[in-house]
Amino acid sequence: MTDRYILAVESSCDETSVAILKNESTLLSNVIASQVESHKRFGGVVPEVASRHHVEVITTCFEDALQEAGISASDLSAVAVTYGPGLVGALLVGLAAAKAFAWANHLPLIPVNHMAGHLMAAREQKPLVYPLIALLVSGGHTELVYVPEPGDYHIIGETRDDAVGEAYDKVGRVMGLTYPAGREIDQLAHKGQDTYHFPRAMITEDHLEFSFSGLKSAFINLHHNAKQKGDELILEDLCASFQAAVLDILLAKTKKALSRYPAKMLVVAGGVAANQGLRDRLTQEITHIEVVIPKLRLCGDNAGMIALAAAIEYDKQHFANMSLNAKPSLAFDQFPDSFVIN
């Protein structure tokens, strides 16, 4: 059987990435050009800065990915690209590059939802078993997704306000931590105790929705009031208390989803899936079903995950024409108008 190679492009936020996937789940390369240092001084991602950085490095990422994989453009079977959700300017850079490369090399173009990429990153670890439930946790999204079969995604719960990763970054900024703050909060939390009381919004309610704005506000108010009064705050305990509240909410809603849907596997993915506290709680508390979490290198934004999701769409011959456009607010159940079903 002839090997299949998919080149994938990811540029939805502040990482420029190009990867090569061989067949179903073998990543030959996954080149990532991070912009974290450029955005640190702003305390968050500046869309215009992100777009300019993508333009500067994306050609080199293509070259490096092919060289690292040891193949040439003539060996490729398809080109995949993230077309949403994300920052519109950033998405357009990746789309333009992917479309130009696909057109120049006479290759089909596969449109991929960024969040489907996060979910399908778990395929590199082991074959997924369906139906499954996915908890997707990142800086821009917090979602519970039911996946009855490959490529069929149904959101069954999502945040009503802040995403969990966004909450981490905002409380991190209040504490004077470096952006992005998730990893540092996790590390500090392991050294502290859950001594401050923070709300667990909607944790006992029957639905599968999340809310983190109240928790974020409670944290900011506590921190502000203590500073005003000159009270001492123990940073490690603050982080431990905040993280305990976050994990209580995530675990409660995930367990509720597992009790309602006929799942054979739980996938936990997205940037926040790198959180060691979350990984520990999941393995300790969810033992009746297999839990699959992507390796750390595939938790953040990367083109490897886009390639892994694209393999599913390739099998279904879900290709797009060159009118494919960026969809910054793309939902899981949306498909591009430019699909060409062969």
From Swiss-Prot:
Record InterPro entries: ATPase_NBD (IPR043129), Gcp-like_dom (IPR000905), KAE1/TsaD (IPR017861), TsaD (IPR022450)
Entry cofactors: Fe(2+)
GO terms of biological process kind: tRNA threonylcarbamoyladenosine modification
Subcellular location(s) per record: Cytoplasm
Catalytic activities: L-threonylcarbamoyladenylate + adenosine(37) in tRNA = N(6)-L-threonylcarbamoyladenosine(37) in tRNA + AMP + H(+)
Binding, Fe cation: H114, H118, D301
Sequence intervals crossing the membrane: none
Main localization (coarse): cytoplasm
One GO MF term: iron ion binding
Any one GO CC term of the record: cytoplasm
EC number, as in UniProt: 2.3.1.234
Chain sites annotated for binding substrate: L136, V137, S138, G139, G140, D169, G182, D186, N275
Keywords for the protein's UniProt record, in alphabetical order: Acyltransferase, Cytoplasm, Iron, Metal-binding, Transferase, tRNA processing
Database matches in CDD domains: ASKHA_NBD_TsaD_bac
Annotated cofactor note: Binds 1 Fe(2+) ion per subunit.
Family stated for the protein in its record: Belongs to the KAE1 / TsaD family.
Known role: Required for the formation of a threonylcarbamoyl group on adenosine at position 37 (t(6)A37) in tRNAs that read codons beginning with adenine. Is involved in the transfer of the threonylcarbamoyl moiety of threonylcarbamoyl-AMP (TC-AMP) to the N6 group of A37, together with TsaE and TsaB. TsaD likely plays a direct catalytic role in this reaction.
PANTHER family noted in UniProt: TRNA N6-ADENOSINE THREONYLCARBAMOYLTRANSFERASE, TRNA N6-ADENOSINE THREONYLCARBAMOYLTRANSFERASE, MITOCHONDRIAL
Stated name of the protein: tRNA N6-adenosine threonylcarbamoyltransferase
